[in-house]
Design a protein with these regions (language model features):
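Structural signature of alpha-helical solenoid repeat scaffolds
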Residues: 225, 272-273, 316-317, 366, ...
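Amphipathic alpha-helical interface segments within eukaryotic helical scaffold
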Residues: 346-350, 356-453
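Long, well-ordered core segments of solenoidal/helical folds
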Residues: 248, 294, 298, 341, ...
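Intrinsically disordered, low-complexity regulatory regions
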Residues: 1-200, 469, 478, 490-524
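Elongated alpha-helical scaffolds that mediate protein-protein interactions in large eukaryotic proteins
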Residues: 12, 133-138, 148-340, 350-359, ...
Length: 524
């Protein structure tokens, strides 16, 4: 407004039509702002009578030309009237607008209220409208809000609140199962499972015409798999846990009824994904017909490598937590099944396919062996005792123990077995019938590994105790004292442990004393 007045002043005090129009618009805006300020002021302060005169400017009016001096006789603005209101109002604008803007900004920050579940809804909107995963939506939301906070400092406080809520949602967001199921992802996942249930129901009446539904089923399975991978795992859990895992049990029955290889492979991928969502899924599958069905499928279709690998992986997942198996399951997972696994490992073809088969089946063998606490009833050890040699099994197990890898650790769930590879070796060397499966060269490598681990591990570490126990079994059930590989180094290590007086070393010292007592003729 001052610019318009300055232009008019330089033009002899004459306003053009365009300038007058712009002034009217600006004055209307000023009236609106003033009314808002009065409303805010009336809520926080006692009421006062409005001034009849406009606020005087805080600085002198612009210097007028000689023409304007002659026409305006005085410098102070006149009492507002219909003819002079625009000029006086315009002169007072700079101070009034600044004050009012400051008041509005301060008040608007106080009045910003973030609605409940705002962050949850924002993350879901990002998922729906962009197709990104639930995890990625956190990154996107944080990036946007941080950018707004940086570029618009006046709203930094509410942006900080939003960032804090995002962190809380990521780390400890708590929602009822009902609210999770009602989310967009929850509804989509439930819809996909309902479609699978319909296919399962139709499978009992399948005819040649229904085989045309294969592309549709595959698309639905792929869509469901994508949803489960991208969605919030809490949402997936909530949907799965409904009615005692009804959707999961229905999918297992559908797998049992479905014989098309392409659909079976897709279902196996689905089971693998579900195992990673909730530990309870593994418990449910362990007590279902799925393990027996997978064991039967593997033995009936040995030429289908892809089906073998997927079935083996899902079985390894189901056995990974070492939960007790239902007794009736041993009718299908019997000696015949273990013999099949070992035979496939030892007769695996050369090349990449053979390597994949060995890796997968050895992992399954280790996972299955976790479930046996009684050595006499251990199906895996009973079958190995009848084998003359297990070269591939031995080499793979030695590689795993040397690398300190456990192929059975697939999830972060609690497990009943700390290390499947170490447990397998403890079982093998617990009997002379199985300890002879390892060649002398393998034994020497194993002794080097045991010495390294026992030396490096700290007192109180459960693994050190297990390695010491394994060393004692090697001394007991092999011909170690015929070659005495690394004997002096092992003796020094054992004597050092025997002298440890920490409470954490008590169990280890007990094992060492048993070794010295049992083999006193060899140790000085």
């Amino acid at each position: 407004m001052e610019v318009i007045h300055a232009q008019a002043t330089s033009n002899g005090g004459t306003y053009t039509n365009e300038q007058r129009s712009n002034l009217r618009k600006l004055i209307e805006h000023r009236k609106m702002v003033l009314s808002q300020v009065k409303l805010i002021s009336s809520e926080s302060q006692s009421e006062t009578e409005p001034s009849t005169f406009p606020v005087q400017p805080s600085r002198p009016a612009p210097k007028l030309s000689s023409v304007s001096k002659h026409s305006l006789k005085r410098r102070a603005p006149p009492v507002p009237s219909s003819s002079s209101e625009e000029t006086s109002a315009a002169y007072s604008e700079p101070l009034t607008c600044t004050d009012c803007s400051s008041a509005m900004t301060s008040e608007s920050q106080k009045e910003i209220v973030i609605p409940p579940n705002f962050i949850t809804e924002l993350l879901e909107k990002l998922r729906i409208n962009s197709g990104i995963s639930y995890t990625t939506s956190f990154v996107v939301a944080e990036t946007i809000i941080n950018h707004i906070k940086t570029k618009i400092p006046s709203i930094a406080n509410p942006m900080d609140t939003l960032l804090s809520e995002i962190t809380n949602e990521k780390e400890c967001g708590v929602h009822s199962n009902e609210s999770l199921i009602l989310t967009h992802d929850g509804q989509c996942i439930e819809k996909a499972f309902l479609a699978l249930t319909e296919h399962k129901d139709d499978a009992q009446q399948r005819s040649w015409a229904l085989h045309m539904d294969e592309p549709e089923i595959l698309d639905q399975l792929k869509e469901l798999l994508t949803l489960l991978v991208d969605a919030n795992q809490k949402v997936s859990k909530a949907v799965l846990q409904q009615n005692d895992f009804e959707y999961l049990q229905s999918t297992v029955i559908y797998f049992q009824m479905e014989h098309r290889a392409s659909i079976r492979l897709q279902l196996l991928q689905l089971f693998g994904c579900l195992c990673g969502i909730d530990k309870e899924v593994i418990t449910q599958l362990l007590c279902s017909v799925l393990p027996g069905e997978l064991a039967r499928t593997m033995q009936d279709m040995p030429q289908d490598l892809q089906l073998q690998l997927y079935s083996s992986l899902v079985l390894t997942m189901i056995f990974s937590t070492a939960e007790p198996l239902p007794h009736w399951l041993y009718d299908q997972l019997d000696k015949k099944f273990v013999i099949y696994l070992i035979s496939c490992i030892e007769n695996a073809p050369d090349g990449e396919d053979g390597d994949q088969l060995i890796d997968s089946f050895v992992g399954l063998l280790l996972a299955f062996n976790q479930h046996f606490s009684d050595l006499k009833k251990n199906l895996v050890m009973n079958v190995l005792a009848t084998c003359k040699t297990t070269k591939n099994v031995s080499e793979k197990v030695m590689l795993l123990i040397n690398r300190e890898e456990d192929p059975v650790v697939l999830f972060d769930y609690p497990r009943n077995c700390s290390n499947s590879v170490l447990k397998f070796l403890l079982d093998v060397f617990a009997s002379k019938d199985t300890s002879g499966l390892f060649f002398t060269s393998d034994m020497m490598v194993l002794l080097e590994i045991l010495l390294r681990q026992i030396t490096d591990l700290n007192p109180g570490n459960q693994l050190r105790t297990q390695y010491l126990s394994l060393l004692r079994l090697v001394f007991t059930n092999t011909d170690y004292f015929e070659h005495k590989h690394l004997f002096s180094e092992i003796e020094l290590c054992l004597k050092r442990i025997e002298k440890e007086d920490e409470a954490e070393s008590a169990h280890d010292c007990q094992v060492v004393r048993k070794i010295f007592t049992q083999f006193h003729t060899h140790f000085s």
